[in-house]
Curated annotation (Swiss-Prot):
<keyword id="KW-0949">S-adenosyl-L-methionine</keyword>
<dbReference type="GO" id="GO:0004719">
    <property type="term" value="F:protein-L-isoaspartate (D-aspartate) O-methyltransferase activity"/>
</dbReference>
<keyword id="KW-0963">Cytoplasm</keyword>
<protein>
    <recommendedName>
        <fullName>Protein-L-isoaspartate O-methyltransferase</fullName>
        <ecNumber>2.1.1.77</ecNumber>
    </recommendedName>
</protein>
<keyword id="KW-0808">Transferase</keyword>
<dbReference type="GO" id="GO:0005737">
    <property type="term" value="C:cytoplasm"/>
</dbReference>
<dbReference type="GO" id="GO:0036211">
    <property type="term" value="P:protein modification process"/>
</dbReference>
<keyword id="KW-0489">Methyltransferase</keyword>
<dbReference type="GO" id="GO:0030091">
    <property type="term" value="P:protein repair"/>
</dbReference>
<dbReference type="Pfam" id="PF01135">
    <property type="entry name" value="PCMT"/>
</dbReference>
<dbReference type="InterPro" id="IPR000682">
    <property type="entry name" value="PCMT"/>
</dbReference>
<feature type="active site">
    <location>
        <position position="60"/>
    </location>
</feature>
<dbReference type="GO" id="GO:0032259">
    <property type="term" value="P:methylation"/>
</dbReference>
<comment type="function">
    <text>Catalyzes the methyl esterification of L-isoaspartyl residues in peptides and proteins that result from spontaneous decomposition of normal L-aspartyl and L-asparaginyl residues. It plays a role in the repair and/or degradation of damaged proteins.</text>
</comment>
<dbReference type="InterPro" id="IPR029063">
    <property type="entry name" value="SAM-dependent_MTases_sf"/>
</dbReference>
<comment type="similarity">
    <text>Belongs to the methyltransferase superfamily. L-isoaspartyl/D-aspartyl protein methyltransferase family.</text>
</comment>
Amino acid sequence: MTSQRTRERLIQRLYEEGLSNARVLEVIRRTPRHLFVDEALAHRAYEDTALPIGHNQTISQPFMVARMTELLLAAGPLDKVMEIGTGSGYQTAVLAQLVERVFSVERIQALQDKAKERLAELNLRNVVFRWGDGWEGWSALAPYNGIIVTAAASEVPQSLLDQLAPGGRLVIPVGGGEVQQLMLIVRTEDGFSRQVLDSVRFVPLLNGPIA
């Protein structure tokens, strides 16, 4: 089912789980998640669960998309955000409706090609894509006010810290095991502040682009 009622049920569940940013919840409500999964899984698109998208990757559960987006925007609007891990393009689409410009990096070209098509179908034109290694980020267009990483890094990549603007926020799952820690890192005048927030489960952030 992809009816409005199933979407409303999802939003109510996210609200009950403690998510409260009205703008983020409204974007989740109106973004057609069923377009970002294979047709065979479309009936499960509005369940609060991660779903496979091929290439050993998943579309993140809506709670985690909303949670990470809330953390990114908690200090106010952002005009320039880098996303590491385009994946299905769902998180990208959510960001594109909340920030001025999104720069999205994906190592698996086939996934990114599909994501481009989906965002074009939704007429989201403020996203620029790069096929490449997420560990490296996109230094040519740095700095960024916000960086969001949708796969778990074994450690925080120094290259991403270097590409964060003063006052910028990095939301990233960190850890090499089955369960990782969601971290919020903010660039301050004299370095970086780091907060460990939630225990999470993400696919690993891998090196090297794949055609």
